[in-house]
Each structure stands twice: as structure tokens, then as C-alpha cells.
Amino acid sequence: MKNLIAELLLKLAQKEEESKELVAQVEALEIIVTAMLRNMAQSEQQMLIRQVEGALEGVKPDASVPDHDTELLRQYVKKLLRHPRH
């Protein structure tokens, strides 16, 4: 029983570490996208935003991906492009 609990705690710690790494990656990408958008002329920003949104519209997610997840991704991309971090 103690071994089982120890294994579960170890797996939980590994998952938590993986989660932290993913959060760090997402935050790094947000910072990069924000910096890039800030250094672009307004017309270039709008062109990039239209291209990204157009690319998203053309993507058909796999049937195994829940609609909620797809919508969450679309909303997050829109938020990042239209209202970047300050």
C-alpha cells in the first residue's frame, strides 16, 4: 500500500512538473507575440491578424477534439492578437 501511494505521489509530481513547463512555454510565446505585434506598424498588425484568423477558419479539427476545446483555442488566439499582454 505504501508503495502504491509513493508511486502515485511520484506520478503526480511528474505531472505537476510537466504542467509548469507547459505554462512557461505558453507565457514565453505570449511575450514573444506581444513584442512582435508592438514592433509592427498598425497595417502590418492588421494584415497578420487577418492571416492568422483566416488560417484558423480553414482548419478542421480532428473529430476527437471536443468543440469546447476548439472554441477555447479560437478565443485565446483572438484575445492574444486583438488584446495582447501589456
From Swiss-Prot:
GO terms for biological process: cellular response to starvation. It holds the Pfam family Anti-adapt_IraP. Keywords: Coiled coil, Cytoplasm, Stress response. Its main location: cytoplasm. It is found in: Cytoplasm. One of its GO terms (cellular component) is cytoplasm. InterPro entries: SigmaS_Anti-adapt_IraP. Residues 1-47 form a coiled coil. Interacts with RssB. Inhibits RpoS proteolysis by regulating RssB activity, thereby increasing the stability of the sigma stress factor RpoS especially during phosphate and magnesium starvation, but also in stationary phase and during nitrogen starvation. Its effect on RpoS stability is due to its interaction with RssB, which probably blocks the interaction of RssB with RpoS, and the consequent delivery of the RssB-RpoS complex to the ClpXP protein degradation pathway. Belongs to the IraP family. This is Anti-adapter protein IraP. The gene is iraP.
